[in-house]
């Protein structure tokens, strides 16, 4: 587990420009007061972004080949079995329609972790 944590720490220092942008939008409870972590280890995996309270994993994907997609499916299955909900976005989705990405994250958070206080 220490190897995974060490690798996660390294990844936090080497974010892609897409990860940097999404982290800017999610960090420090800027996003609807939900707390997110970046490059968060869960088991033998490292999640791009995680809201632990809602058990939501947000993944950003670049160009992929078949082996990577198969790995991602297996990883998502394992995370689902552990109670995590995973949503994925392509890197270009963030640049092309940032608002839609944030809206989808918020809708998912509200579904998984509804606010204890109803909005007026």
Locate the predicted segments by residue:
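A generic structural motif
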Residues: 34-35, 84
